[in-house]
């Protein structure tokens, strides 16, 4: 039986999530890929402002529980700051992999992406995801590029 309220919210029928529009980073993309892994039917919307009546998971925008763009953003004991992906993984990882494997995955995969997002420290996977962002003169939408990147991240 699921005791994780966030996991229940993600897995419910007609589940929804919201994140920022515009340029995206690996933490946004892997957050969306994680949500889609847990519920392939979840609707993920991007926008400039979270609608007041939105009832779903909000990440990397809106100053909520899964947004790290705040003055009092959390930092791990080892000094690596959380980004959206790390905040979601912290809440969901143990349910998915168990405590020991979730911690190892956090250290090896999530933390480097979080660190890249917060500090700009070089990360090849983050650079790959960043390359999906359209150039200023390219056709197509940021949303289309975002969901292409999410598709690659979810492979």
Regions found by a protein language model. Give the residues of each.
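Short, intrinsically disordered, charge-balanced linker/junction segments flanking boundaries
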Residues: 149-155
């Amino acid at each position: 039986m699921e005791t994780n309220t966030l996991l229940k919210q993600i897995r419910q029928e007609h589940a929804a999530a919201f994140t920022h529009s515009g340029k995206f980073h690996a933490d946004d993309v892997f957050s969306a890929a994680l949500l889609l892994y847990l519920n392939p039917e979840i609707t993920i919307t991007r926008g400039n402002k979270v609608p007041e009546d939105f009832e779903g998971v909000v990440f990397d925008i809106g100053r909520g529980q899964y947004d790290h763009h705040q003055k009092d953003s959390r930092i791990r004991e080892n000094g690596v700051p959380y980004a959206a992906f790390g905040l979601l993984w912290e809440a969901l990882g143990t349910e998915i992999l168990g405590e020991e494997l979730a911690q190892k995955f956090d250290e090896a995969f999530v933390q480097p992406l979080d660190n890249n997002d917060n500090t700009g420290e070089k990360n090849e996977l983050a650079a790959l995801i960043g390359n999906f962002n359209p150039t200023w003169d390219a056709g197509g939408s940021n949303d289309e590029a975002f969901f292409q990147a999410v598709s690659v991240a979810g492979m």
